[in-house]
């Protein structure tokens, strides 16, 4: 396989791994970080750590996944995904298709 394709695949796998590790390491946030007001009628604080809607959506999805799946299943999925990525890279590196 061409070195350029290997470099692209390696970059994508590295980016995906970093994204997954960041997601796992992120701590759960209170509802005020999502912009949800409490029943007392107070407005959410717009402090210096303003978050984009994409980060809020990511945090919402992470909370949904954490509440629906046990932690062991999440860890097993991440380890399996990393193992499959490594095996895919080894397959690409070792097996060179014959033309």
Swiss-Prot record:
One of its GO terms (cellular component) is plasma membrane. Its main location: membrane. Keywords: Cell membrane, Membrane, Signal, Transmembrane, Transmembrane helix. It is found in: Cell membrane. Disulfide bonds: none annotated. The keyword Translocase does not apply. Residues 27-73 are extracellular. It comes from the Eukaryota. Residues 95-99 are cytoplasmic. The chain crosses the membrane at residues 74-94. InterPro entries: Smim9. The keyword Transmembrane helix applies. Residues 1-26 form the signal peptide. It is a single-pass type I membrane protein. This is Small integral membrane protein 9.
